[in-house]
Amino acid sequence: MIISKSFKAPLKFSVKSSTAPVISNHPPMENHPKRQRTTRLAARNLKRKLSHNTDGAPIVTQLIDIDDEPIDLVVAIRRHVEVLNSSFSDPDFDHEAVKEAAADIADLAKIDENVEIIVENGAIPALVRYLESPLVVCGNVPKSCEHKLEKDCALALGLIAAIQPGYQQLIVDAGAIVPTVKLLKRRGECGECMFANAVIRRAADIITNIAHDNPRIKTNIRVEGGIAPLVELLNFPDVKVQRAAAGALRTVSFRNDENKSQIVELNALPTLVLMLQSQDSTVHGEAIGAIGNLVHSSPDIKKEVIRAGALQPVIGLLSSTCLETQREAALLIGQFAAPDSDCKVHIAQRGAITPLIKMLESSDEQVVEMSAFALGRLAQDAHNQAGIAHRGGIISLLNLLDVKTGSVQHNAAFALYGLADNEENVADFIKAGGIQKLQDDNFTVQPTRDCVVRTLKRLQNKIHGPVLNQLLYLMRTAEKTVQIRIALALAHLCDPKDGKLIFIDNNGVEFLLELLYFSSNKQQRYSSSALYELAKKATSFAPEDSAPCSPTQQVFLGEKFVNNPTMSDVTFLIDGKQFYAHKIGLVASSDIFRAMFDGLYKERNAQNVEIPNIRWEVFELMMKFIYSGRINIAKHLAKDLLVAADQYLLEGLKRQCEYTIAQEICLDNIPEMYELADTFNASALRRACTLFVLEHFTKLSSQLWFAKFVKQIIPEIRSYMTDILTRPVEASPPTVV
């Protein structure tokens, strides 16, 4: 199972990572969001563009104006490096000049564009050499404490390492790890020096920045003994040092199991848990980031963290004013609530659900993503499912489906999938318009679509018994908007055997038709889709979608007698041509022919009967049908043959003509087809047109004539739906989710 975790950002960065989400395969639709870089030092990055000098002079001006003479920046940096190097070869070096050079390079390094020049001019080796302890004995007299010099060198190295991985390696190759670890261990020495704590803090920052996203350097830090002093510094009196140590542990623990194990073995967890309760957002922010990285892909450490009492403080941080802390807390809650965890209910009981739902409305998209992730995990418990829905979680999660970011959509969809497992939530889903939202299909990745499909199937399997009764009650008593949403949802979700109960007995069809008649184009599309789905469910196939059966008349003389003078007792005249026929077959086929030859009409005793207004080839096909009960209807003759079949009341032939014509219905001819069906009372063709309109409503809605046409056919839609819903329907088998 792949879960990306947060990592400690180097000092340089102030922009959050935008790595694409990774969607795991367990649970099958759950997105495991990536931990983002900390923004603890984002403000510091912005300050680099400003002056850090206490006297207010602009940094660049101060650095490049030496002895009141402007000089080139490269030359200035080169001079500073030369001064730093001179102390190692000149016993009479100017100590103050060295301190000033280190401070100037540190200030220059605060501007990203300067770092490359600093590196190219050999500053890294010189800076690393000054990381040694200032308490070096010269003869029998110790040198004075020079913590500011060390602090500035450490600060410069940390800023340089933050720029690119190549600089990290240059610093390590210059031998920085060992002296940096020694600085971390300098606890209690020269406590009276004002910069002593700052040196330790900047040393921790070096660890943070050289180890960032560099597995080999993380391992080197552990091998050189760097983890133990960092753990000890978590209890340092200076809060800034605590924070820096937690940040360094956060970095070195990311995706490094050996480092994680050592941190836990050194008993860092209790102190990190205490730091979660700090009122300083920068402190609890680093602590929760470190804990998150320790927990990542480490079930045993996760249990240790919970046993150390982290659960309640983490839940409390969901209400932090720091967005990054909220995000980290939500992600950690999601990890605590993993599928194999038994503390989902405990998390809810301790008050996590309400702040998580509130976080769904955050302006920070990553906070939203992590809170949806946590709710998705918590929603795997039945009691939590009801609690999340009761606190308004369904509506907030549905709204997230409109967000275009794939990971946010997917986490929201997965949470909704969990909530749909509880029968108590079905009505809330539908009342909130959730079915329409799920069916809008505005999803950016296929796994989210798959998740939504399964959610709809899960809801569909619950539309029976008490759930159906509750929805029917609401459809009778609730406000009109809710009634319509229920009708729309049930059209897609109900069992066909309940169609009459819902849509005829409880007026569901009328709600859908009202929406089709009066509403906006979007609502009309919802209605047409619901009616089309309902029609498909109510019949295994529509009449126009299958060829009709042969007619049930008793006498078929056979095709060999078509236009055969043998035993012919009547001759039809069509287009001046003679067509030989037999009254016995004609009378048996149609009431019109029966009245013509058995009634009081003049044709009864006539030998020749003229047939006007019909073409020979059409009449011949009609006779073939009468004599044999079957014909192949050419598409170009179908309409004329339909007219003839209607005129002579040949219902079997008429049905076959309607079937043939229905195959030619398209977006361009639907008005003409419907008019043809209406003119000749071709009910099957008319219903084929109706079904086509419902199926292709969205495409047709752009036509200027369509709005009027829809209102014209609503009576036919009502008649059609009433007819098919009152037929006996076999129950559909349940869908397994």
Swiss-Prot record:
Chief location: nucleus
Comment field on protein domains: The BTB/POZ domain mediates the interaction with some component of ubiquitin ligase complexes.
Domain BTB stretches: 568-635
Function summary: May act as a substrate-specific adapter of an E3 ubiquitin-protein ligase complex (CUL3-RBX1-BTB) which mediates the ubiquitination and subsequent proteasomal degradation of target proteins. In association with TCP24, exerts a negative role in cell proliferation in leaves, possibly by inhibiting mitotic DNA replication.
The protein, known as: ARMADILLO BTB ARABIDOPSIS PROTEIN 1
Organism: Arabidopsis thaliana
Gene designation: ABAP1
Subunit structure comment from the entry: Forms a heterodimeric complex with TCP24. Interacts with the origin recognition complex (preRC) components ORC1A, ORC1B, CDT1A and CDT1B. Interacts with DUF7/AIP1.
Listed SUPFAM superfamilies: ARM repeat, POZ domain
GO annotation terms (biological process): DNA-templated DNA replication; negative regulation of cell population proliferation; negative regulation of DNA-templated DNA replication; protein ubiquitination; regulation of cell population proliferation
A Pfam family matched in the record: BTB
InterPro entries noted in UniProt: ABAP1/ARIA, ARM-like, ARM-type_fold, Armadillo, BTB/POZ_dom, SKP1/BTB/POZ_sf
UniProt keyword annotations, A-Z: Nucleus, Repeat, Ubl conjugation pathway
A cellular component annotation (GO) from this entry: DNA replication preinitiation complex
ARM repeats: 112-154, 165-212, 215-254, 257-296, 299-338, 341-380, 382-421, 456-495, 497-536
Family matches, as Gene3D superfamilies: Leucine-rich Repeat Variant, Potassium Channel Kv1.1, Chain A
Pathway membership: Protein modification; protein ubiquitination
Location in or out of the cell: Nucleus
PANTHER family: ARM REPEAT PROTEIN INTERACTING WITH ABF2, ARMADILLO BTB ARABIDOPSIS PROTEIN 1
Tissue: Weakly expressed in the emerging lateral roots and mainly expressed in the shoot apex, young leaves and flower buds.
